[in-house]
Amino acid sequence: MKELIYNPDPEPVLEPLFERHSLDEVEWSDLYEVTCNGVKQAVHYTDSFHYAPVAVSGENGGIDVEIAISRPFEQVQIRPSSYGIEFHREGQKLRFHLPRIMKVSVELDGDLKSPLFILCSPKIEKPQNTTICFERGKVYNVATLELHDNDVVYLEEGSVVYGRIYACQCKNIQIIGNGILNGSPWHLPDSNGKLFLVDLRWCENVRIEGITVVDSPMWQI
């Protein structure tokens, strides 16, 4: 991981710096493979961490997690440590049980440069009143997606949306689902930017739920 430097007066980025057009162009982890309740999960990569968004359809008896790790390691820490999650190791594989929907990180040998975040959230179905839908298995480039009154934005599990979301003086907005909103096109590599990733100004009755938000140029929301 390169050193990240905060710039209080970053160079303005007026247009997205790049686009992605297929899942083949998305950055995937080559360090971790994750399975939850027998279902293989997509594991994404950034230069600061790896992450696996997991949409859970009902907790039932919790979540059984298996992680296959491609490099040798000795020590493992699952955080927050206050959760008291115990793991079982077999060679390069870890297994543990999450008693409910929660978000945890897995650290290897105290290395904070490549943790794995397992981000569990309840599965959110597409509402009938959806006005903007990003579908599973597709990559989108929205630059700045401007919302209006009563917009319902649905990011389906398995969708990746590159860009940011903006609204001003709007009412009854929803941004929901289990997909990913990625703000990396809006800042220079290894530096911050000036724009909020989800920028909702003087809006009323706003719901944001379920989505995974990463790599913002500034504050996420």
Segments (PLM) and residue ranges:
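Extracellular/periplasmic carbohydrate-active domains that bind, remodel
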Residues: 1-221
